[in-house]
């Protein structure tokens, strides 16, 4: 999972990771400490304060959108296998995956596949 640094941080301990505002850090572990995450920046690993970063959402997660909007988004991505995960409209608390499963035909994409996860 990626995050972006909201502020610069200067490490004061050998196991901490220094970074600058705007850096993109790879989060390796979010579970060991409630205030610190283990992260990587340019091949170096260390702990970072979680309140200094903003976790980037996964590009494939679209949250609460309709099936129709999911299809529109997939048409814009315009490639076979493009997918997204969204909250299920028909089964609250579950998720659906929408996949472009056909190659482009003329001006629009072929059928989409929608499956409920759960």
Swiss-Prot record:
Similarity section: Belongs to the GRB2/sem-5/DRK family.
Phylogenetic lineage: Eukaryota, Metazoa, Chordata, Craniata, Vertebrata
Pfam families: SH2 (PF00017), SH3_1 (PF00018)
Protein name: GRB2-related adapter protein-like
InterPro entries per record: GRAP_N_SH3 (IPR035645), Grb2-like (IPR043539), SH2 (IPR000980), SH2_dom_sf (IPR036860), SH3-like_dom_sf (IPR036028), SH3_domain (IPR001452)
Entry annotated with the keyword Protein transport: no
Keywords linked to the UniProt accession: SH2 domain, SH3 domain
Biological source species: Homo sapiens (Human)
Superkingdom of the organism of origin: Eukaryota
SUPFAM superfamilies, A to Z: SH3-domain
Coiled-coil boundaries: none
